[in-house]
Amino acid sequence: MNEIFKTLQIIAKKISEEVKYADFGYTNHQNSTGDTQLKLDVKSDSIIEAEFRKISSVKSLVSEEKEDELVLNENAKFIIAYDPLDGSSLVDVNFAVGSIFGIYENEIKAENLKAAAYIIYGPRLEMVFTDGNAPKFYRLQKDGNFAFINELKLENKGKLNATGATQKNWSQTHRNFIRSLFDEGYRLRYSGAMVADLHQILMKKGGIFSYPATSDHPNGKLRVSFEVLPFAFIYEKAGGATSDGKSQSLFSIKISKIHQTTPCFFGSKYEIERLHEIYG
């Protein structure tokens, strides 16, 4: 696992340089969920693949930008599932974007997730990593190395409300939930980049991020293996809670396909309790 952690630091620095000077153009290809790929998405994916090819403990890679699992070492232990550049369409307006990683043992199942990480490319280059303990927060220093800053802990109740999806497609239940949060004094914080929005809630020690089921995406839009579960792991290890709107945890999800999606909610315990009160 230490070798994977060190590789994530290398990847962070390489993708950070690409983000600074990238060609923002689109390719002529779509990924598995129908999104037209940006050249920067493809470049970020190739950087990650190249670095993990150097590690003998990595069995295979599963990426948002790859249709199928890419086997590297059949007898190895770890499967890396990742979104190479979450929020890439926001690079041209200079918003913070990020990379998300889930490290699974032997097979992609919720119960096999052993570690998770994300990298955020903003004014500063930062990374959060957990191997099952409290998430650790790192920041790149002037000497070119990542320094440990602190462990992350969510308070029982926050103040931030980051809610995604197009409002006209929300269910009435979700409208009621979001309205109840605003009535309590919650502040809207939503950039359109999952990494940036979830990072802000962690840094501010509480709140909720939601991407609900909608009329146009009844099974949600975010991908279970390489977006949802890695962040669920981080949030729950930080003392928070998660749900798909029905379950007590996103870890109750049974994964049947690589690019499976789900509605998802991540937050402090209070906000997830309120979710269940209103969703039923």
Curated annotation (Swiss-Prot):
Its cofactor is Mg(2+). Pathway: Carbohydrate biosynthesis; gluconeogenesis. Homotetramer. GO terms for molecular function: fructose 1,6-bisphosphate 1-phosphatase activity; magnesium ion binding. Its main location: cytoplasm. It catalyses: beta-D-fructose 1,6-bisphosphate + H2O = beta-D-fructose 6-phosphate + phosphate. One of its GO terms (cellular component) is cytosol. Gene3D superfamilies: 3.40.190.80, Fructose-1,6-Bisphosphatase, subunit A, domain 1. This is Fructose-1,6-bisphosphatase class 1. Its EC number is 3.1.3.11. Mg(2+) 2 binds at D83, D86, E227. It comes from Campylobacter hominis (strain ATCC BAA-381 / DSM 21671 / CCUG 45161 / LMG 19568 / NCTC 13146 / CH001A). Signal peptide: none annotated. It is found in: Cytoplasm.
